[in-house]
């Protein structure tokens, strides 16, 4: 076993490689996230559920070397999904709009625990609906773990619905 992942606490067998320094992640955790990414990309989900994985991973793996924008956008994506009903494509569009609007995203104090579930819990679920549901639950736990920061995140977006492009992708997948 390798040491626990600094972001989520996941303990997996050693994996050669490194995790990007802008995430507080172990190589094994990062490799598992890569497996989830590959799985999600081959599914071609029109609502782009994978955006929820991107945002949950960024928020759960915030660390001293993380870029403030990565954690902020992770939390914004979770807020837009769980509090505003956006699907992944709509969150992706909101991120694109917000990226050009501000350059000084603040660093928030991370909670001591960022959810009991990890990306490995998502990958342990059966492929298909069960894994999708597990991904949503993981992301929801990460969002709830940051509850002390919810008002700040909501304050960054005084009119979140203006960020919602008319959907061509069907109903939200949250």
Regions found by a protein language model. Name each.
Residues 1-174:
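Intrinsically disordered, low-complexity linkers and terminal regions
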